[in-house]
Amino acid sequence: MTTEHHTQAGALQLRSVTKIYDAKQGQHRAVDSINLDIEAGKFVTFLGPSGCGKTTTLRMIAGFEDVTEGEITLDGQSLVSVPPEKRPMSMVFQSYALFPHLTVKDNVGFGLDYQKLPAAEREQRIADGLALMGIEQYAHRYPHQLSGGQQQRVALARALVMEPKIILFDEPLSNLDARLRLRMRSEIRALQQRLGLTAIFVTHDQSEALTMSDMIVVMSAGTIEQVGEPREIYHRPVNRFVASFMGTASFVAGTVSEVRGDRYLVATPLGDLDTAGVPGLGVGDHVELVVRAENTAVGLDAPGNEQAGEGSDVVLEATVRSAAFDGSINTYVLDTEAGTLEGRSHGMNELHAAGEKVTCVISRESLWVIPADSSEK
């Protein structure tokens, strides 16, 4: 179970993968013709709301769901007709799926019984797995005698002793408390990097996706909305759905008045603004500015600014609709000439009350333009 002896990570390809369920109202496309390449050794997260198809896609990769149409290949070899137990993959489930009547050691070694390994190798793999997860001292305990975090580590050890090419995670942190979730996501990411595993992680938690992933696949209604590195997904969303799902965003309507290479001059209620945006927009296109709450400084956090113009930050007056203290930050919903915006200030600053007039400054460089008709599902 050392880095040197772990099975080589696998590269996965999905081509026009579709899953159709029969329902009383007719056929339901849970996953609709998705295409995806996952490089060996990468941590990839399927992110989206409930019912978007992320878990169904994971289960098709694992072999727990049949593929209605399309192809899934691992290192160039088709998996479609390969049963789950023959696929070089391990899955960590949301419920951990530990056997209550088996000790930790026997739970970790359960899958190895089907590999018919020599006894000495089996024992060594179990010992390595327990050591890797730091749970050797719990080897003879039963699951009910463990905390949630300890059970999670047992489930991880059980997956890793199989020496998979790919490890699959089906929302494994959702049953843990907030503090333990933070610790476990750091441990899982560090372990994946140490072993060089290919990992596919399913979650609806944007923070998990942003902090753990090499690549994020944002899904909605059975389709892929956007694939990219975390910073790209967050700062350069392709449409309103992605922008809204990743963090807190407001939207300001505008029209493209000039194309300037890879930037646009956009006429908005905030003035004419030079900003970057989704490629391919043209003069006259109706667009929306994506305005992130953390880039909208309120009150004392609004810096001094020269007279507003297309190249400067945006200064505007607003009326506080609602405000809340959230520890390190104050959060605001604001009524402005450009519509409703959300903003932030430092938690040590005064919390402005509803109805107060405040000054806000929006960082122009943080603005991003998307098509006005981009989907919000």
Q: Residue ranges of each PLM-predicted region?
A:
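Helix-to-loop junction immediately C-terminal to a conserved catalytic motif
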Residues: 62
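ABC ATPase nucleotide-binding domains
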Residues: 82-241
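Conserved ABC transporter NBD signature motif
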Residues: 70-78
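Non-catalytic connector elements of ABC transporters
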Residues: 249, 259-377
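The feature captures the beta-strand-to-loop junction immediately N-terminal to the Walker
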Residues: 47-49
